């Protein structure tokens, strides 16, 4: 199964994806980690073109992993999936792989997102160098509502509640 971790920066997508992968023997494929593996620091653009390229490599990797174990959960992380074409591309690949898919849209209050983003920036724990509250506001302004079937997860509620909600979705 391919699981898209959607939502604005700082909404808890990575934390939830990692927890779900640990509990299900799944695999998190992170766009930010792929980007840093593929490009030298001076080549990193944080552009839609480079993001789309990284996502394509992630989808090829997902296909390879699923060909070895079709029951595995693959969590696609590191992209807000703020544009419909991004989701449509993933769903087309899932269909071509004969894989079910789920969309988990993480949401939280703006204050929580701001706090998380500021903490990540201060601690240097996140791979994306452009990830800050300004990016949150920019992505929010252009975020296209997800019209595909999805489960909305309020990450202000705590990790256990979020995991339970997500597990209901992926097991359904």
Predicted features by range, described:
Residues 5:
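Hydrophobic anchor at the beta1->P-loop junction of P-loop NTPases
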Residues 95-117:
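Conserved phosphate-donor/acceptor-positioning beta-strand/loop module used by diverse small-molecule
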């Amino acid at each position: 199964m391919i699981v898209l971790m959607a939502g604005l920066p700082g909404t808890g997508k990575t934390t939830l994806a990692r927890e779900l992968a640990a509990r299900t023997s799944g695999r998190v494929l992170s766009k930010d980690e792929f980007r840093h593996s593929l490009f030298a620091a001076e080549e990193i653009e944080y552009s839609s073109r480079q993001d789309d390229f990284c996502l394509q490599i992630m989808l090829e990797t997902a296909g390879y992993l699923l060909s070895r174990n079709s029951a595995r959960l693959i969590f696609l992380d590191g992209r807000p999936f703020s544009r419909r074409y991004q989701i449509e591309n993933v769903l087309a690949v899932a269909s071509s792989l004969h894989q079910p898919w789920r969309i988990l849209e993480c949401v939280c209050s703006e204050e929580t997102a701001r706090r998380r983003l500021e903490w990540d920036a201060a601690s240097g724990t996140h791979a994306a160098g452009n990830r800050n509250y300004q990016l949150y506001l920019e992505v929010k302004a252009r975020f296209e509502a997800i019209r595909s079937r999805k489960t909305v997860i309020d990450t202000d509620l705590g990790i256990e509640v979020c995991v339970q909600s997500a597990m209901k979705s992926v097991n359904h």
